[in-house]
Amino acid sequence: MNMENTLPISTLSIIQMRDVSASYDSENLILKNISMNVKRGTNYAIVGASGSGKSTLLKLMNGMMIPSSGVVLYNYQKPDLKNKEYKKSIAKIGYIPQTLGLVKNTSVLENVLIGALPRLNNLKSFFKMFPKEEIEKAHDILDLVGLDAKSERKVHMLSGGEKRRVAIARALM
């Protein structure tokens, strides 16, 4: 018997949004009263017209933005950067910004390894020495997106599509 299927939907959620609204200023509401559960182990696509709030919704979901009203919970916890469990939960949320956010003059591999930083809790060792298992994972992901052979190439030397795949690989870290 699969016990997971007998649990209430909210028990399976990694992200819960309850009556969330968001705005960038006091005048213009971008999102209004959004409620949703993002279930663990599932993939979602957010589709909408330009300016409809897709990026804003993603920023709310991964803790990059605080809602104007309502609450966003991660594994049933309110955002708290001092809480170790919260930081672990939020580090599992991949996000590919529209501008990609690649670090110029660094290699493809280094850009992908940036995705491991929230888990490592040690930003001081940024490019010095990543654990061997993180480097192996990065190579596996680069292989998955067809870029492992270019792992040492500088990102500014890549095509637009290759840069997008580097950003996807980083989100998968």
Q: Which residue stretches match the model-derived regions?
A:
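Conserved ABC transporter NBD signature motif
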Residues: G70-L81, K88-S89
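Hydrophobic anchor residue at the start of the ABC signature
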Residues: I168
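Conserved ABC ATPase "signature" region
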Residues: S125-K150
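Helix-to-loop junction immediately C-terminal to a conserved catalytic motif
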Residues: N62
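The feature captures the beta-strand-to-loop junction immediately N-terminal to the Walker
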Residues: V47-A49
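A short, flexible loop at the N-terminus of ABC-type nucleotide-binding domains that lies
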Residues: E4-M17, A22-N33, K82-E85, T99
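Conserved ABC ATPase signature
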Residues: K154-L158, E162
